Curated annotation (Swiss-Prot):
This is TPR repeat-containing protein BB_0298. Coiled coil: none annotated. InterPro entries: TPR-like_helical_dom_sf, TPR_rpt. Keywords: Repeat, TPR repeat.
Length: 230
């Protein structure tokens, strides 16, 4: 009987040891990927394994639901880097189910939706993702109204896609008040003023953009626009 109990205890010890080792290996893999900057596909698989296979122990491992939400975001970001915008949107949405006020997740859904719309050919699908992009940027700004990336993104959509020039002007003015003066911003302001029929300010901002141009392509692009305006 003593021998039987000894065998049982040894088996239990080995079983617990293997389980602990498995968890430790998973944590080690995550740390190694974070440090080494491992590829997106590898990270996605590890993050999925962490969430799906270890779901029963998730609270013990990460200590809070917020950390679980973070892994949904990380998966979304890796899909985003791969240009797989549909799955990216799915995982950012999972994050928002836990943390609906995450302005970054709303922003990334907006960018992913916008990029997805640009690659589609079916009109209804394009409109669907353009609407999702706009609503996501607006939701991001409703949570944090000074988030520059969302301000620029919604302005870009309003100038080039939705022709909401007055709304774009308001957002661009806000970015200007915040000190933005990089090339892409100045070009967008020029395009906005041109669309509003204000050629004086359009030329002013295109001229400012030309001084910020850092590549030959940028310089030639501004030059072509300026020559057509004058």
């Amino acid at each position: 009987m003593k021998i039987l109990w000894l065998i049982i205890l040894v088996n239990l010890f080995l079983s617990c040891g293997n389980e602990s080792k498995e968890k430790s290996n998973l944590g080690l893999r995550l740390r190694e990927l974070e440090i080494s900057g491992g590829g997106s596909e590898s990270k996605i698989e590890v993050y999925k394994e962490f969430i799906e296979k270890e779901d029963k122990n998730i609270l013990k491992i990460v200590n809070s639901i917020d950390k679980k939400a973070r892994f949904f975001n990380l998966i979304g970001l890796e899909f985003f880097k791969l240009g797989q915008y549909g799955p990216a949107i799915e995982y950012f949405a999972k994050n928002l189910e836990i943390n609906p006020n995450n302005y970054l997740s709303h922003f990334y859904i907006g960018v992913a939706s916008y990029n997805l719309a640009k690659n589609l050919r079916v009109k209804d699908e394009v409109e669907k993702y353009i609407i999702l992009a706009e609503n996501s940027f607006l939701k991001s700004l409703s949570i944090r109204d000074d988030f520059k990336d969302s301000l620029f993104a919604i302005s870009n959509m309003y100038v080039y896609d939705l022709d909401k020039q007055l709304e774009a002007k308001n957002y661009l003015n806000k970015l200007g008040d915040m000190g933005e003066d990089y090339f892409e911003f100045l070009m967008l302001r020029g395009a906005n003023y041109y669309s509003l029929g204000d050629l004086g300010n359009a030329i002013l901002f295109y001229d400012k953009a030309s001084k910020k141009a850092s590549t030959e392509e940028q310089k030639e692009g501004v030059s072509r626009i300026m020559s057509n305006l004058k």
